Amino acid sequence: MNHLLVADTFDPFLLEEATISTALTVPIDGHINKDFYPAEERGEDCIPWELQSFSKIKGLCFDLIKGKHTPLYFKFVLHMQPDKAAAMLTKAQVDPDIIRALVLTIRYDGEKTVLTTGCAYQTFTMDKSADTAWDKALKKYLDLKGISYEEL
């Protein structure tokens, strides 16, 4: 839980959605409401993505989870930042234009945490090289951060 909500491990990701279930169940939509901001703060320089950076929302998530009881459940759906996803796919010799998002779902069921990768494609394809590259890159990242895992 420290890697998820305290350390900077998942800061390079964007939050699509989260659900946290403790005494209450709280859904969080990670899509940014650009109308909330004045016109001069809505440009791509100020708000570069449609989704909120996980680093800006993890404090709220931590506040919802902290306490003397462990949460009953939580789920975070994260996207790799588009520029980082494109660089990783290009390095793996995969056309980044075929991918809408590289997705990481982190789900805790009260006993164990499961990380699931996925690729959101622009269109249907039988080629799964992007999935393979994303799986490989995430395993390398988890190893680099010292996070142990078991492949299912």
Feature-to-residue mapping (PLM):
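Surface-exposed, low-hydrophobicity interaction/linker segments
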Residues: 44-112
